[in-house]
């Protein structure tokens, strides 16, 4: 059996930076209680290891309000502005491990909304990154994930301006399709493609590998937006695409008759 491993397999820059930030805080502040607001990344194995080292995951804003000491680390996906404001008001020390590319979107959304733009976020409304982005809007914001939602989108006034941004891990081709639908409405619109270049390149590489192999294995956490999209992309190119999280999930019987296998791992 011939195996082809994606060259860019593994954590992206923003995820690796966030993981390193947590371990650095553990090492440098061993006497302090370390918290992360939400799972620092979508990787169950990494989260378990951090918990063994004493890191506690805070899952709600109500829990966060009870924290009076220690260090809170903001997850790689970012948080709404109100969370940063809450930490400042309570005098809680925190470290912002938001991916720099996501942080850039926060700045864009805050600035454009203050200048009167209606913000359109193309992405998954259930994903913490999108929730965080929406939380930096100073005015109206709409999340669009499907073609139906794009067609249904309407401004209250035609004099409104629109600024479109995207979840960094959104499928690039879907983004283009949704932007085209919104653009047909002839609004005063600016479109900022904020999909991470690394995401786009990894999606293209995964698709190219999947096209030329007999079976494709996508490795990653089931909650990871990147992994879900890579599985979808690979499945479109290779019918025998498998989604696993650990080695124990791999059924070798499914691969006995194949000659070439592609492997793509991703986390976010």
Residue map of PLM features:
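Alpha-helix C-terminal capping/helix-to-coil transition sites in glycosyltransferase folds
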Residues: 68-69, 211-212, 257
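A general structural motif
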Residues: 143-148, 168-175, 193-204, 222-223, ...
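A short glycine-rich beta-strand->turn/loop micro-motif centered on a GG-aromatic cluster
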Residues: 60-61, 98, 123, 190-193, ...
């Amino acid at each position: 059996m011939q195996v082809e491993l994606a060259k860019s397999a593994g954590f992206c820059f923003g995820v690796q930076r966030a993981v390193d930030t947590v371990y650095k805080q553990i090492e440098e502040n061993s006497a302090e209680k370390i918290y992360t607001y939400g799972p620092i990344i979508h990787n169950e194995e990494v989260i378990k290891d951090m918990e063994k080292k004493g890191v506690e995951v805070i899952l709600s804003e109500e829990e966060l309000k009870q924290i009076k000491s220690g260090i809170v680390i903001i997850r790689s996906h970012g948080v709404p502005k109100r969370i940063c404001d809450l930490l400042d008001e309570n005098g809680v020390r925190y470290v912002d491990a938001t991916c720099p590319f996501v942080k850039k979107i926060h700045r864009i959304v805050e600035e454009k909304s203050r200048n009167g733009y209606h913000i359109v976020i193309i992405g998954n409304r259930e994903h913490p990154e999108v929730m965080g982005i929406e939380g930096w809007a100073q005015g109206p914001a709409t999340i669009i994930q499907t073609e139906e939602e794009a067609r249904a989108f309407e401004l209250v006034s035609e004099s409104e301006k629109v600024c479109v941004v995207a979840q960094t891990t959104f499928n690039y081709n879907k983004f283009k399709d949704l932007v085209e639908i919104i653009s047909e409405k002839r609004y005063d619109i600016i479109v900022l493609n904020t999909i991470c270049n690394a995401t786009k390149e990894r999606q293209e590489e995964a698709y190219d590998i999947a096209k030329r192999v007999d079976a494709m294995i996508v490795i990653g956490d089931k909650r990871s937006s990147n992994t879900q999209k890579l599985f979808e992309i690979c499945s479109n190119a290779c019918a025998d695409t498998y989604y696993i999280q650990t080695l124990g999930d791999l059924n070798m019987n499914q691969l006995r008759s194949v000659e070439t296998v592609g492997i793509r791992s991703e986390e976010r």
